[in-house]
């Protein structure tokens, strides 16, 4: 087989719709655009959300709330994630979490939640730990060091 002999699989391609090629084609004369009007023109049509002269929905609705610029965004992990990725006796910190692929970037810190079971004794050094997560880590023989 050569490069010039390659063909697409049978039935995987479709011929383009040929517009304006006579009334017998089914899409002749006005090419499926009807008669005159904004939608019949080249580049015609309205932008998304445009409702004619009516006030658009986005502007009819009241404004609400604000964005807190001091909000902290934690990377959230569960104890089951630690169970899957770490060996017994390991130290769980930013570097080790990055190495095993649990975090890609550190936003404002890492928080561990208590979903799942933990059987390995781990030393966890993160910013926040939920009460249930802390109980499970200690019950498995590990330590929690909140930085």
Swiss-Prot record:
Kindly provide the name given to this protein in its UniProt entry: Large ribosomal subunit protein uL15
Q: Which GO terms describe its biological process?
A: translation
Q: Which proteins does it associate with, and in what oligomeric form?
A: Part of the 50S ribosomal subunit.
The record's annotation in HAMAP family points to:
Ribosomal_uL15 (MF_01341)
Question: Which family is this sequence assigned to?
Answer: Belongs to the universal ribosomal protein uL15 family.
User: What species was this sequence derived from?
Assistant: Desulfitobacterium hafniense (strain Y51)
UniProt keyword list:
Ribonucleoprotein, Ribosomal protein, RNA-binding, rRNA-binding
Q: Which domain of life is it from?
A: Bacteria
**Cellular component terms per the entry's GO annotation:** cytosolic large ribosomal subunit
Function recorded in the entry: Binds to the 23S rRNA.
User: One GO molecular function term?
Assistant: rRNA binding
Region: Disordered; residue ranges are 1-58
Locations of Gly residues compositional bias?
21-31, 42-52
Keyword RNA-binding attributed: yes
Question: Gene symbol?
Answer: rplO
């Amino acid at each position: 087989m050569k490069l010039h002999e390659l063909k697409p699989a049978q039935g995987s391609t479709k011929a383009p719709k040929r517009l304006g090629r006579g009334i017998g084609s089914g899409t002749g004369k006005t090419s499926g655009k009807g008669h005159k009007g904004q939608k019949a023109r080249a580049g015609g049509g309205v932008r998304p959300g445009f409702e004619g002269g009516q006030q658009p929905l986005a502007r009819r609705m009241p404004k609400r709330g604000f964005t807190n610029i001091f909000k902290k965004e934690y990377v959230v992990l569960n104890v089951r994630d630690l169970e899957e990725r770490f060996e017994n006796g390991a130290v769980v910190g930013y570097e080790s979490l990055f190495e095993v692929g649990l975090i890609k970037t550190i936003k404002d810190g890492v928080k561990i939640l208590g979903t799942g079971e933990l059987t390995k004794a781990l030393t966890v050094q993160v910013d926040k730990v939920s009460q249930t997560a802390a109980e499970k880590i200690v019950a498995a023989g590990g330590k929690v060091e909140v930085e």
